[in-house]
Amino acid sequence: MDWRAESAELWAFLGSLRLGEILSGTVTAIESFGVFVALDDGPPHPLYPGVGFITIPELSWRRFEAASGVVQVGQRVSGEFLQFDTWNAEARLSLRAMQPDPFRAFAECTTVGRELHGHVTKLVPFGVFVQVADGIEGLIHRRDPTLTPDDVVQIGDDVMVVVTHVDREKRQLLLSRQTTGQL
């Protein structure tokens, strides 16, 4: 669809937005691929339920099962403007950018070798994810020598782990089984 010809007002509005600008509006629809937001100062979208759009990863730093666990239709939100999606004529927003990054604070006070208590959140072919703090998950890789075939864990199991690597840039936490305990 040629958005310029279809809606000059919409195109002018989107073209006026600046990277990092904070936009407010109301959640109008929640889909499996993201959330539509009717922006306070924006015109209506000719096709979609809102000019603002938040992709699933930009909703929160924390793990969630569905977007409806983070926002609700009718809820007021404010998000940082990330980009103008020229294909869909949408303002891409981030709620996550408006929240403190829990990994940053965690990484500041965590050192390699630190023992942590956590619980198993996900089992994947390459290892086990363990939540060690609110919004913080680490991976015990299947190549970890302390993770043997005899170790059978289920989602929700409590475990003791040791921090083996913290990558602040990639926001990655690598863990190992605690040598004195059981996974």
Residue ranges and their predicted role:
Residues 1-183:
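Single-stranded RNA-binding regions, centering on S1/OB-family and related RNA-binding modules
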